[in-house]
Amino acid sequence: MNACTHSCDPSPNMEEVWKRSLIRVTDEFTLPPVVLRVDDAIIGTLGNFSVSTGKAKAKKTFNVCALVAAALINGQVLEYRASFPETKRNILYFDTEQSPYHCQLVMQRILHLAGLPLDREPQHLHFSHLRAIAEPEIRRAIIRYAIYHTPDVGLVIIDGIRDLMHDINSSTE
């Protein structure tokens, strides 16, 4: 006897999605365009997610600044090298932890590393501070809106991603 009730039956749509999601050992795929490298190591391909983690005060923000600076000039900054297609040059940077003052310092550090002037808005960098917005749902909605309403986005940085949820240990979030 089957213990499943009506809720166990997959809908035809789910069945179709499930089948399309399967990967076979004989499938052939090509490497997505490599857009970020550290020396010769690939750290970012177009369309994929990467995470930078480390202990507090471990210079994560500085490394992200160098990476963003490389993406901003589509070239090399320190050991980071970026090569984004022209149709994916916009960078969205969201900070959930720092004040506008400190966010501006981060932006200035990025521009300095990129060799760009500090008296003009950078063409491809959109920097947003979200600390003043308390609700994680609203922060996520703003990020989602920016991603879907900014043309040619190639890189999204979220500094403080844990602030996009109420409880980092919650299995439902």
Positions of predicted regions on the chain:
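Conserved inter-motif catalytic segment of the P-loop NTP-binding fold
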Residues: 85-172
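The Walker A/P-loop phosphate-binding site
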Residues: 7-110, 117
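Long, basic/Gly/Ser/Thr-rich N-terminal segments
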Residues: 1-5
